[in-house]
C-alpha cells in the first residue's frame, strides 16, 4: 500500500461506530490480556534538536520535555511579541492592501476585543467567524482570545442547514461574516435560518431556530439587523471600554477554552473540538521551534499562507505561529489561488510556503511557473491530504524548498503531533510524516488487544500530551469514546513506526474521504441522499484521483420503478450542501457487496467503482 504523507488530518477523529468487532472500546478501558499500554510519565530528555527514539523495540515514543511548556494566553503572546518586535511587519493581506506591524496589530486587536465586550459579549460566549481569508478573520481570531470569548471556526462553504447545526450545537451568541464572497451570499443564507434578522434591532436578535444568537456583525456592508464591524472596533477605542477589557483580562487563564473547530466522523454529525490557549499557544510554539524560527531574522520569517483560516493549518500553523514567533504572515488570496501564491512569494520575498498537496500541484502546474523568483523561498509545510513521494521531490527541486517539512496531526490534537525536521533527508520526508513533537507521546497499538506493536508493524496510532483537546463541546460521552480517562487520544489512523522514530501512516480505520485537504464524511452525504424522493439507498466512497487525492463517488440504488440521471442528482445537491461535498461521480447500482452478516463492505465497493470508472 502506498505510504500516506502530509496528513494534517483536519477533522480526523475516533468515534463509537459499529464495525465487524462491534462498538469501539474507549482506550481507558483495558484490552483483554493487555500488558503493554505505553503508559509512561513524562521524563527529562533533550530539547528539540536531537531525535527521540522508540523505547524497547516497541512502537512507543516520547518527545523531548526539557524545553518548558508556555503558560500564556494568546493575548499575552501577542503583547510580548509586539513589545519585542513593535516595528516588524506582522500581517500583510495582499488582496486587501493591508499592512500592519506588530504594534499596530496589537492596537487593532485590543480595540476589537474591547468593542466585542462593549456590545455585550463576555468571557465564555461563543462567537462564530464565517467567511474566506481576510483581515477581519485574523482580527476576530485574536480579538476573541484577547477578551476570553470562544471563537467558533465556521466553514465558509456551509449552507443553511449546516450553519444552523453548528450554531445551535455550541450555542453561538454572535456571528461575523462578509455580505458575500463569489456565489456565497452569507447574509441571505443566515436569513434562511433566521428570517427575523431583517427586522431585528442590531444586537438584539430573537430567533426561534437559533435562540442563543443575539448579535450579528457584518464585515463590509450595513445590513438590516446587523452591527458593522468597523463600528464595533471604533467603539472599542474609547478609554472606558479599553479599561473594561483590561479588567476582564485579569480573569483569563491559559487553560480557558479559546476555539471550537468542527470535526466529524463516520456518524456524520459534526462535533466541536474544543481547544484552550494552552493547547494552541504551545502547539504553535513547537511548530515554530521545529522550523528553527527562533534563530531566524525578520527577513527569513515571511510565511505565505494560501490555506483557509477556518482550518487548524491556517489558524494555528499560520496565524498563531506568526504571533508567537514574530513571523510575518502573508495572506495571498481570500481563497486558494495558485498564481496569487506564486506572486506573493516573488513580490513579497516569501521564505516559507504552506499548502496541501492539491495546492502544491496547482502551483507547480501554473503556466507561467518558471517566470517567478524563488530565490528567497527556503522551505514550508505540506499537510492536509495524501502527498505522493514524487510531489515532495518536485516541490523541493523546482521551488528551491530544501527545508520543506511534512506534517501530521488532527484537529483534536491542536493539531500537530508529528513533523519532519528541515534537515531531514529527501527520502525521510518522502517516506514518512516525520518525528514526534516535544511534550507529546505516541503509541501504536494492536486494535484487537490494545498491546503495543513491534516496530514497523501497523496498528492504531494514539496520542497523549498537552496537545489533546479539552473535549467535544457538549458531548461528554463522545469525548470519552475518543479520549479515555488516561488521556490517550485514538486517532483512528493505522500507522507504523521505524527504529529512528519516523511515523508512517499506512491506512485509515474509517471511511473518511480526503478531497484536496477537505475531510468528507460519507455518512453525512448518505443521509442527505436519502432525502431524495427517488433514492432507496446510497453509499458514498472515495476513489483515487491524481490531482485531488480522492474524489467522491456516490453509489445510488433507486426505488423500484424509479429513474433519474446523474445531472439531476447533482442539481439536487446544489445550494443544499457545500460545493466540495457534491460527488464528482454518480453511479447507479442494483446492490452492494455484503459480509455474511449483511454489512456493506466499503473497501470492496471502492474497488468496484474504481474498476467501473477505469481509474
UniProtKB/Swiss-Prot annotation:
Known catalytic reactions: a medium-chain fatty acid + ATP + CoA = a medium-chain fatty acyl-CoA + AMP + diphosphate; octanoate + ATP + CoA = octanoyl-CoA + AMP + diphosphate
N6-acetyllysine found at: 179, 182, 199, 340, 398, 510, 544, 570
Keywords: Acetylation, ATP-binding, Fatty acid metabolism, Ligase, Lipid metabolism, Mitochondrion, Nucleotide-binding, Transit peptide
A Pfam entry, by short name: AMP-binding_C
Transit peptide: 1-49
UniProt xrefs under InterPro entries: AMP-bd_C, AMP-bd_C_sf, AMP-binding_CS, AMP-dep_synth/lig_dom, ANL_N_sf
SUPFAM superfamilies in UniProt: Acetyl-CoA synthetase-like
A GO term from the CC aspect: mitochondrion
GO biological process: fatty acid metabolic process
Residue numbers bearing the N6-succinyllysine modification: 182, 478, 544, 570, 599
EC number annotated for this UniProt entry: 6.2.1.2
The protein's role, per its UniProt record: Acyl-CoA synthases catalyze the initial reaction in fatty acid metabolism, by forming a thioester with CoA. Has some preference toward medium-chain substrates. Plays a role in adipocyte differentiation.
Family: Belongs to the ATP-dependent AMP-binding enzyme family.
Name the record gives this protein: Medium-chain acyl-CoA ligase ACSF2, mitochondrial
Organism: Rattus norvegicus (Rat)
Amino acid at each position: 500500500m502506498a505510504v500516506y504523507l502530509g496528513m494534517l488530518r483536519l477533522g480526523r477523529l475516533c468515534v463509537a461506530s459499529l464495525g465487524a468487532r462491534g462498538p469501539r472500546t474507549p482506550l481507558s478501558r483495558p484490552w483483554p490480556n493487555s500488558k503493554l499500554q505505553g503508559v509512561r510519565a513524562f521524563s527529562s530528555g533533550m530539547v528539540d534538536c536531537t531525535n527521540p527514539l522508540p523505547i524497547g523495540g516497541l512502537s512507543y515514543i516520547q518527545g523531548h520535555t526539557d524545553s518548558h511548556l508556555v503558560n500564556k494566553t494568546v493575548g499575552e503572546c501577542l503583547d510580548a511579541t509586539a513589545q519585542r518586535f513593535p516595528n516588524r511587519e506582522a500581517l500583510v493581506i495582499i488582496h486587501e492592501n493591508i499592512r500592519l506591524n506588530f504594534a499596530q496589530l496589537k492596537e487593532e486587536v485590543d480595540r476589537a476585543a474591547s468593542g466585542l465586550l462593549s456590545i455585550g459579549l463576555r468571557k465564555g460566549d461563543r462567537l462564530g467567524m464565517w467567511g474566506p481569508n481576510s483581515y477581519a478573520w485574523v482580527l476576530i481570531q485574536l480579538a476573541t482570545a484577547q477578551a476570553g470569548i470562544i471563537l467558533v471556526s465556521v466553514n465558509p462553504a456551509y449552507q443553511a442547514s449546516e450553519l444552523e447545526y453548528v450554531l445551535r450545537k455550541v450555542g453561538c451568541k454572535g456571528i461575523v461574516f462578509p455580505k458575500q464572497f463569489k456565489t456565497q451570499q452569507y447574509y441571505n443564507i443566515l436569513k434562511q435560518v433566521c428570517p427575523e434578522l431583517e427586522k431585528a434591532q442590531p444586537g438584539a436578535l430573537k430567533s426561534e431556530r437559533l435562540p442563543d444568537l443575539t448579535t450579528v456583525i457584518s464585515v463590509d456592508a450595513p445590513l438590516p439587523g446587523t452591527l458593522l464591524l468597523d463600528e464595533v472596533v471604533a467603539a472599542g477605542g474609547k478609554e472606558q471600554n479599553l479599561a473594561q477589557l483590561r479588567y476582564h483580562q485579569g480573569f483569563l487563564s491559559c487553560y480557558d477554552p479559546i476555539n471550537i473547530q468542527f470535526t466529524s466522523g463516520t456518524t456524520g454529525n459534526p462535533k466541536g473540538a474544543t481547544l484552550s490557549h494552552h493547547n494552541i499557544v504551545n502547539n504553535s510554539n513547537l511548530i515554530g521551534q521545529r522550523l528553527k524560527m527562533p534563530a531566524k531574522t525578520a527577513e527569513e520569517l515571511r510565511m505565505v499562507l494560501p490555506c483557509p483560516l477556518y482550518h487548524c493549518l491556517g489558524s494555528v500553523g499560520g496565524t498563531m505561529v506568526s504571533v508567537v514567533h514574530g513571523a510575518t504572515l502573508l495572506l495571498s488570496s481570500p481563497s486558494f489561488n495558485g498564481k496569487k501564491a506564486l506572486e506573493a512569494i516573488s513580490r513579497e520575498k516569501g521564505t516559507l510556503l504552506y499548502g496541501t498537496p492539491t495546492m502544491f500541484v496547482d502551483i507547480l502546474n501554473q503556466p507561467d511557473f518558471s517566470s517567478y523568483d524563488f530565490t528567497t523561498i527556503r522551505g514550508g509545510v505540506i499537510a492536509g491530504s495524501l502527498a505522493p513521494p514524487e510531489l515532495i521531490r518536485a516541490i523541493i527541486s523546482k521551488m528551491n524548498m530544501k527545508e520543506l517539512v511534512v506534517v501530521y496531526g488532527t484537529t483534536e490534537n491542536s493539531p500537530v503531533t508529528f513533523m519532519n525536521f528541515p534537515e531531514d533527508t529527501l527520502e525521510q520526508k518522502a517516506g514518512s510524516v516525520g518525528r514526534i513533537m516535544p511534550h507529546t507521546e505516541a503509541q501504536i497499538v494492536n486494535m484487537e488487544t490494545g498491546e503495543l506493536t513491534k516496530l514497523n508493524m501497523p496498528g492504531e496510532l494514539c496520542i497523549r500530551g498537552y496537545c489533546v483537546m479539552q473535549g467535544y463541546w457538549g458531548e461528554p460521552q463522545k469525548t470519552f469514546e475518543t479520549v479515555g480517562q488516561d488521556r490517550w487520544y485514538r486517532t483512528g489512523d493505522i500507522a507504523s513506526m521505524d527504529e529512528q522514530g519516523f511515523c508512517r501512516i499506512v491506512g485509515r480505520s474509517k471511511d473518511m474521504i480526503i478531497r484536496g485537504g477537505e475531510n468528507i464524511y460519507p455518512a453525512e452525504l448518505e443521509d442527505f441522499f436519502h432525502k431524495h424522493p427517488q433514492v432507496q439507498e446510497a453509499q458514498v466512497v472515495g476513489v483515487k484521483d491524481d490531482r485531488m487525492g480522492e474524489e467522491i463517488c456516490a453509489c445510488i440504488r433507486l426505488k423500484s420503478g424509479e429513474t433519474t440521471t446523474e445531472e439531476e442528482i447533482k442539481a439536487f445537491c446544489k445550494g443544499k450542501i457545500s460545493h466540495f461535498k457534491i460527488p464528482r461521480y454518480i453511479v447507479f447500482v442494483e446492490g452492494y457487496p455484503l459480509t455474511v452478516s449483511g454489512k456493506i463492505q466499503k473497501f470492496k465497493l471502492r474497488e468496484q467503482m474504481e474498476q467501473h470508472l477505469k481509474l
